[in-house]
């Protein structure tokens, strides 16, 4: 184990020092909800065991962003600077989600330079969960709730403070910067403190603590399952599940002109919306909720896995907690695979 222990009463001071050099994004209260936001004051940070309502996805893949601009003379606007950012307090499910987005935006046939620039300018600091939250099923997706290697530093909390485990060279450099700043309250992890970083057993395969939730077998049989129509009946097509999801990445482009300046924007979209697949001819290959809801589940559990090697559901439970119709993606997948779907 390689890392340090940060006393709990020093975490705010540590965040304040980081804010002198970096944009720090962390869980904080906003209108009563716990969300990831850019901190204006280190006292805002909330590092309890409560799950954030939204994931930090929007700080790497913004809900709306300008990607190109030019004036009437043909002058193209220069790309804006990407601030050096620390994403702090990212849960294992959201770290796994960032692996999915990285596979889609960087490791596929094309590289999304906007996502890549933000990712390269970001230091990821993970935070383990202590307990399972309502709607969560990360361990049934094969994700440990209290550990992750998909970050630069990983924090584990106990009554004394936080064990900061160094995962990457970027993480080591950050801790070296803090130490160089004269902070002497860090204790190296060694001897009796080594147990501080011991995690719950989270083995996979034959030793998995939970049965792994996935869609297997013949893809066409799942696609043609006659239960999709009944399953989708309760869906109201609001798109909340897509906007709250840490892995959803559908988007659209639109152009806007103002005072001689034209800009192209990218903004989030959702396959749950009727017009998402509407053709200019008027034809829509997904005309009803049945086709759209099936697409959402199949995309997450089958198509992304086929194309990029990951299941695009990390069991974070946000869609389960947020759906106004009470739809549960875990129950849907289990019901489809077991043939036991029932409307509750």
Describe each model-derived feature in a short phrase.
Residues 88, 226, 230-236, 240-243:
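Short, well-structured alpha-helical interface segments that form or flank functional binding sites
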Residues 210-233, 251-344:
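Ferredoxin-type iron-sulfur electron-transfer modules in oxidoreductases and energy-metabolism complexes
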Residues 239-256:
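Internal helical hairpin/lid segments
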Residues 23, 241, 319:
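Residue-level detector of anion-binding/catalytic polar loops
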Residues 98, 246-250, 324:
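Active-site-flanking alpha-helical
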Residues 1-218:
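Iron-sulfur-associated redox domains of electron-transfer enzymes in respiratory
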Residues 26, 244-245, 322:
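A generic structural-conservation signal
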